[in-house]
Amino acid sequence: VASTGMLGQIIPPSIALVLLGDVMSNAYQRAQNNMGVFSQETVSVGDLFVGAIVPGVMIVTGYLIYTVIINRKKEFMPIEEIEGEADILKTLLPPATLIFVVLGSIIAGIATPTEAAGVGAFGALIIAGLNGSANLELLRATSYKAATVTTMIFSILIGASIFSLIFRGVGGDLLVDQIFEMMPGGKYTALLFILLAIFLFGFILDFIEICYVIIPLVAPPLLMMGFDPVWLGILMAINLQTSFLTPPFGFSLFYLRGVADENIKTIDIYKGVIPFIIIQLLILLMVVLFPFMIL
């Protein structure tokens, strides 16, 4: 449950990819400026959405295979017959249609992520109204939650911008560039070092903090080495998703601990997610070795 609940961080439409798209676009423009390229290209959120489809499907497939294998050995899940297919379809069709419209409009270039998000919010409100679950109290609580999350993100963004400005002012970005250039083994050693660093930071930091503080510092030097921005963005997105499962501060683990039975120990939750972390790291390695899956 904890692992599959975090698939939304890599499978479009994903808030992590939306945030990462903005960060990678800025990093790519900065890298092009440093290389003297003034007819610049950008990285769109739609590009990341398209690039994340194959890795997302691979992660889901890996989860399914592992779940089937472990269930056959220990028989965790009882077999139940599915009844009421029409009711299931009726429940799934409206949100699936809304996701298709929102995601399709971004990938097709019809709407920006902000415009598509507005359509998605309005569509979700209509669906809630048709289901009879919409009321003023729910709307108030939802608006408050959205405002809280938005405030948190912008607070981190403002702090990260100040940090980045000071860091560049004292020449920190030049130091990072020099460190990358002096690394033995070339650009792939630098890439593996950064991916490992992001993975370790995921044990203690939220993905938003990594996205706005760490990635803007390390992405431009990597892009100047010739890496494709979309491919690099997907690698970092998979890495960021893994941070939700890494103890002790994996947010997915906290959520599961809050709703799980008291008889389930925290250490058992930590042990249970290890195979899923390994699956994600294997998929990450495959994307590194076979970039054509993204490009």
Predicted regions: what they are:
Residues 1-295:
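Alpha-helical transmembrane segments of multi-pass membrane transport proteins
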